[in-house]
A protein has these predicted regions:
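Conserved class I S-adenosyl-L-methionine
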Residues: 1-21, 35, 39, 115-142, 175-176, ...
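Short alpha-helix
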Residues: 142-165
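A C-terminal cap/extension of S-adenosyl-L-methionine-dependent methyltransferases
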Residues: 163-204
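Class I SAM-dependent methyltransferase SAM/SAH-binding core
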Residues: 27, 33-78
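A conserved beta-strand element that flanks and buttresses the S-adenosyl-L-methionine
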Residues: 90
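Short catalytic micro-motifs in class I SAM-dependent methyltransferases
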Residues: 93-96
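A short glycine-rich, Lys/Arg-flanked "PGG" loop and its adjoining helix->strand segment in the class I
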Residues: 102-116
Length: 204
């Protein structure tokens, strides 16, 4: 289906940006249904932990996961882990729904040893015009949308470098035209609805 194609496009971007090494561990913050947590298992051979504040989503994620994945209830703004506890830390379209976005991002960086990847909703996208304006529509209600520059600005003052921005899903919906357009749109325009920012933790 269309949703599956969109998820796979986003997943491809995340895998390429993380570039996992042998034995590395991963914390997926705001894992929700566990879609990305499960989907990253083939490229992560270390420990994987999915964290979410919603007990209902965690129960759903556990039921769907046949692997050795630990799911825990945790607040993104106060993660129950030591500094540099995980090699890789991800948070996919989570920061957009947290009021204290800077505090949550600082926590992600704190518990990361090598690399952090966050997925955000891109304000410079067709999807924002369709779903994001005003208070937002449907599942995007109350979400915060970021321009690529604002997304990079979230990392100001944090111990990271090598920041990189990628986007995917230029045309919403995932139909035939959207799939055709996806590979033909110049990536430097950064107009995809899904905005991925990757950063290396300094001192790793």
């Amino acid at each position: 289906g269309h949703g599956r194609w969109i998820g796979q496009r986003e997943l491809g971007l995340i895998r390429a940006a993380l570039m996992p090494r042998v034995g590395e561990s991963l914390l997926d913050v705001g894992c929700g249904t566990g879609f990305f947590t499960r989907a990253l298992r083939p490229v992560i051979d270390g420990d994987i932990v999915g964290a979410d504040i919603d007990a209902g989503w965690l129960a759903y994620a556990r039921a769907r996961d046949k692997m050795e994945t630990l799911y825990e209830r945790a607040d993104a703004r106060a993660l129950p882990h030591a500094d540099k506890a995980f090699d890789l830390v991800t948070a996919m379209t989570v920061i957009d729904f947290i009021d204290e976005d800077a505090a949550a991002l600082a926590e992600l960086v704190r518990v990361a040893k090598r690399r952090v990847a966050i997925g955000l909703l891109n304000r410079n996208s067709l999807l924002w015009w369709q779903k994001g304006r005003g208070v937002g529509r449907g599942g995007y209600r109350g979400a915060r949308w970021y321009t690529p520059a604002e997304a990079i600005g979230l990392f100001d003052g944090l111990p990271v470098d090598n920041l990189r921005v990628d986007t995917a899903i230029v045309l919403p919906g995932g139909g035939r035209l959207a799939r055709w357009m996806e590979g033909r749109w110049p990536s430097w325009l950064s107009v995809g609805a899904f905005l991925l920012v990757t950063a290396d933790v300094i001192g790793s």
